[in-house]
Amino acid sequence: LHSTSRRQRQMCIRDSIKAVDDYADLLRISVASAGNDHRLGANEAPPAVVSIFLGDELTEVLKAIENDEFFVGHGAVQMDIGAKVLPHFVKDNTDRNRTSPFAFTGNKFEFRMLGSSSSVANPNIILNTAVAEVLSQFYEELKDVPADGMESAVHELLKKTIKEHKRIIFNGNGYTDEWIEEAEKRGLYNLVSTPDALPHFTDEKNEKLLTSHHIFTHAELHSRYEIKLENYVKTLHIEAGTMVEIIQKDLLPAVTTYMEKLAQTAALKKSVVPDISVSAEAALLTRLTELSETMVKDLERLKEDTAMAEYEVDKNLLKSAKLYQSVVLTDMEKVRVSADAAEALIPDSILPYPTYGKLLFSISD
């Protein structure tokens, strides 16, 4: 943006703000996947609510334009690093916000919602098409304006756009519950999961956007909707089945083996010293028994609910996806609680697979 005029920069930002606000649901859909649902809103990833970060100074510039005020910048601020021997330098006035899905940094916008395993093509398609649509709308509004009135018309259009779409601008912490509440008050989408987002793919305004610009036909649009749903369902079906297999074939046998060793140790101690305490072994044996019983019970529920969700695949794919998201994932989280607790009590030598500690911190030949 540095190579363009001030008015062109303002128009570029205006176009982006309107495009993101009008088609925030499509941007969320473009990054929707089972894996990305886990990522968004945590681990330095942006939240599922689409918003734009402009930084304090640029936001003040737009506010001044909206109110027909003259913007007075704060000037260059020296960075205080607390060391006199190091050179002084000017603080970056664009600042940074790693919790923003769509952030302006320096001279560009960054879209940060895309997961590492997904193609950048999908958000590129949506962003480029949305901006093209906005430019087309603005062209229709300005095409009959005489040359001597163009500057004033562009300024008024800029003011109007800021007033209508400033709700999408948010420079705060996107992880807080307060922002989620504020986003709902502003009327922004909060599409937490893929099954929440995908039905909007075929909304009338979205279908009109993508078909009018000859990006997709009606059939292509609906086929992509179904393919995305099917991929989501298949991914969670595989994950649920993998969890069942790991628990049944690996973890539960390991728990049983360790409980057997504990019982043998306690019996051996008693055979040598009849009055010796085996309370530690007994307590650990009791705890592992409780955890294994809970695991078996939760695992049966997981298998039943997975079968129920899978039954709906051919009848109602969206219903199946919602069952996987709201029921099967919840079951998996419950199984995970008792499984993680049991793993923490079992020696590494008995577990048939590496622990997180070994995976993260050990180096094997």
Could you describe each region identified by the protein language model?
Residues A83-A103:
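Conserved alpha/beta core surface patches that mediate binding of polyanionic ligands
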Residues T161-D365:
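C-terminal amphipathic alpha-helical interaction region
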Residues R14-H74, Q78:
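Polar, glycine-rich mid-to-C-terminal structural blocks
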Residues I29-A32, G82, F89, T105-N107, ...:
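Generic beta-strand/beta-sheet core signal
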Residues M11-C12, V145-S152, E156:
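Active-site loops and adjacent core secondary-structure elements that bind or stabilize anionic groups
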Residues R6, L114-A121:
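A generic structural motif
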Residues V85, P101-A103, K108-R112, M243-L252, ...:
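Structured core elements
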Residues H2-R9, I13:
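Single conserved hydrophobic/aromatic residue that forms the stacking wall/gate
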